């Protein structure tokens, strides 16, 4: 008998000669007694019986009978076993925390399945209304659902895949892990099959999804604060000659030539620090995005927000104009990091995990990817 502390499991290994001498009911009795006398919490543990391939090929009937009565047993090997209308692929099993693989049932059929005995669920589905209903039935929070749907749709768009492309969702069943305490379940990860290299997103404590390398699946910032492309009339330049003052002075942002009245968007979530008029900047807006970043938008025709307002990425905050010290209709856009101005082109639009968090994330990601591979 071997204990694996990482996954909170017990491994029992029997010789084939021993197995052949007893009936499957005897095995169930042995395991039941063992569990009752064990200090390990039943609902957070699992038993793994290890058989070699020759035994399994010759004794499929026994194994099927053994699996059905004990729902938290998974076997190691290369052949498949039918498991209560679910298909478990058992090859290369090295301690998966996943019990069953659930395919994309219609909503009504899913309601008829008892999922309370599952710790983890893999759900294969398209991202559509049926998917959202199923996630809600599985007691996943709307915020979690919205988050994963947004990330997946973005990845599909980036990789030029159809929006009805199928993906795999890994759900943690908290009602099982917490002994039926009412708590929302969590989508831990998603996998999008894509050629020879699949696309992954992994849920973190930050309530965001990150890829295998620790980079956020969804951007936290827009590249620029508008939807269409506009000509750069003046680049970021610490030593620029100022056409207004006729002196060398830093140009701390980028100027985009655009028609007056062009909608200007917040590049990310944040709070409005300033929304007023000044002689030089004209109508301008300053947004604090987090503890690190501040963005500024100048020479606006109209301001659509006020100090203290909370804004989301892509919220319309103003209209471009030609106010203040300006030689023509344009938007002056600045980005500040830790109170120092940076070139807006160098803004990292996706969040990156660092140091300890990154190491833990990569380890977690590798484990989950292995489990996705098992159920293909």
Swiss-Prot record:
The organism's place on the tree of life at top rank: Bacteria
GO CC annotations on file: plasma membrane
Location of this chain's protein in the cell: Cell membrane
Residue ranges crossing the lipid bilayer per the database entry: 24-44
Alphabetized UniProt keyword annotations: Cell membrane, Hydrolase, Membrane, Metal-binding, Metalloprotease, Protease, Transmembrane, Transmembrane helix, Zinc
Membrane-topology descriptor: Single-pass membrane protein
GO annotation (BP), single: proteolysis
Cofactor field: Zn(2+)
Residues annotated for Zn(2+) binding in this entry: 251
GO molecular function: metal ion binding; metalloendopeptidase activity
Enzyme class: hydrolase
Primary site of residence: membrane
EC numbers for this chain: 3.4.24.-
PANTHER family (alphabetical): MUREIN DD-ENDOPEPTIDASE MEPM, PEPTIDASE-RELATED
Family to which the UniProt record says this protein belongs: Belongs to the peptidase M23B family.
Protein name: Uncharacterized metalloprotease bbp_296
Source species: Buchnera aphidicola subsp. Baizongia pistaciae (strain Bp)
């Amino acid at each position: 008998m071997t204990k694996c502390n990482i996954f909170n499991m017990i491994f029992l290994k029997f010789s084939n000669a021993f197995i052949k001498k007893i009936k499957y009911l005897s095995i169930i009795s042995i395991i039941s007694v063992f569990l009752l006398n064990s200090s390990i919490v039943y609902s957070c543990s699992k038993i793994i019986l290890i058989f070699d391939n020759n035994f399994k090929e010759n004794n499929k009937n026994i194994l099927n009978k053994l699996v059905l009565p004990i729902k938290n047993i998974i076997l190691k090997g290369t052949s498949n076993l039918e498991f209560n209308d679910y298909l478990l692929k058992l090859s290369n099993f090295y301690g998966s925390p996943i019990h069953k693989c659930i395919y994309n049932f219609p909503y009504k059929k899913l309601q008829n399945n008892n999922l309370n005995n599952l710790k983890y669920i893999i759900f294969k589905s398209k991202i559509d209304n049926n998917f959202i209903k199923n996630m809600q039935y599985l007691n996943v929070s709307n915020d979690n659902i919205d988050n994963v749907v947004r990330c997946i749709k973005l990845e599909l768009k980036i990789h030029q895949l159809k929006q009805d492309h199928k993906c795999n969702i890994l759900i943690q069943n908290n009602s099982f892990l917490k002994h039926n305490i009412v708590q929302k379940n969590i989508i831990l990860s998603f996998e999008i099959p894509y050629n020879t290299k699949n696309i992954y997103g992994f849920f973190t404590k930050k309530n965001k999804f990150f890829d295998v390398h620790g980079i956020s699946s969804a951007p936290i910032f827009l590249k620029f604060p508008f939807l269409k492309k506009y000509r750069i009339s003046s680049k970021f330049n610490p030593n620029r000659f100022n056409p207004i003052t006729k002196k060398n002075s830093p140009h701390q942002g980028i100027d985009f030539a655009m028609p007056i009245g062009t909608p200007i968007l917040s590049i990310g979530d944040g709070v409005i620090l300033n929304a007023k008029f000044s002689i030089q900047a004209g109508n301008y807006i300053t947004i604090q995005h987090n503890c690190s970043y501040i963005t500024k938008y100048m020479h606006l025709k109209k301001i659509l927000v006020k100090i203290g307002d909370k804004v989301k990425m892509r919220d319309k905050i103003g209209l471009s104009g030609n106010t203040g010290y300006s030689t023509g209709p344009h938007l002056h856009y600045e980005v500040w990091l830790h109170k120092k101005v940076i070139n807006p082109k160098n803004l990292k639009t996706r969040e990156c995990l660092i140091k300890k968090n990154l190491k833990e994330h990569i380890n977690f990601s590798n484990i989950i990817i292995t489990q996705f591979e098992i159920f293909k």
